[in-house]
Amino acid sequence: MLDTSIQALINKWQKYLVLQRNYSNHTVISYNNDLKHFLEFMNYYNSELVTINHIKTADIRLIRSWLAKRNCDNFTASSISRGLSAVKNFYRFLEKTTQLNSHIIFSIKSPKKTKLLPKALSEDDVVISLEHIEEYGNVKWIELRNKALLVLIYASGLRISEALSITKLHLQNLEFIRIIGKGSKERIIPWLPIAKNLITQYLEILPYKLGDNEPIFRGKQGKKLQPPVFNRELIKLKHFYGLPQHLTAHSFRHSFASHLLEHGADLRSLQELLGHKSLSTTQSYTKTSIKHLEAVYTTAYPIKK
């Protein structure tokens, strides 16, 4: 239960994240859940309904107690770090829009996250997926949608949220796609004919009329397709063909990067294609490729101990 004035602030903050910071719906939902968890803890901590004054005067003991509670509740370091980032983001918004001055929360450092290497699929698993994804959907246009979307992600390295934002306007350029990614960072990605041809075939039988600025990938009822819906299609594929547990829409983006590296792509070009702000993020794929080479070496090298 939240005070109505606080809920109004949260609503404004969410609009700010979407309209001015270009955050994805997925990120906004996650941030909102984290903030509400923090405010619920503040309710419990203060034994009364939280007001804007409670938020402004929250001290370091309260914030550290909340982080400790999340740790005791078995939240991962990554989830705890994201939660703290969400609350800090809300406080920054309050600085911009209210009389809140610099807050103690900005001095608290996030817990160190365990760095997990991106999990790519083997080239064989990608081929199996692309060949059989059309078997799921029950309706021809949905089957073709699934294949077009999966090929697009693997052929271009798009995030699922970026792929689901593709419109007819993106199709007008014959050579490249212009993508606005995380942090409003723009990048240009070459169109591969196979991806564009599949999308064209899909649009020819799509039973819904779309404007040039509307996302082309639609759900059964004609609304914009959402990531969880598409991932459910991939779960069916994964279970039936015994594909790796980490197979998701995002794993095809990882596979795009890893396979390009294995076939000789340079890191700087890959950084541009993936839309990474930092080269160090892209370098994580080199570790994945090295592990792949080690596995091949161990299995295939003729001289063994």
From Swiss-Prot:
Domain (Tyr recombinase): residue spans on this chain: 116-298
Subcellular location: Cytoplasm
Keywords of the record: Cell cycle, Cell division, Chromosome partition, Cytoplasm, DNA integration, DNA recombination, DNA-binding
Molecular function via GO: DNA binding; tyrosine-based site-specific recombinase activity
GO BP terms: cell division; chromosome segregation; DNA transposition
Main location class: cytoplasm
Gene Ontology cellular-component terms listed: cytoplasm
Domain of life: Bacteria
Domain Core-binding (CB): 4-95
Active site: 159, 182, 250, 253, 276, 285
Record bears the keyword Cell cycle: yes
UniProt subunit comment: Forms a cyclic heterotetrameric complex composed of two molecules of XerC and two molecules of XerD.
HAMAP family: Recomb_XerC_XerD
Family statement: Belongs to the 'phage' integrase family. XerC subfamily.
Protein name: Tyrosine recombinase XerC
Provenance organism: Rickettsia africae (strain ESF-5)
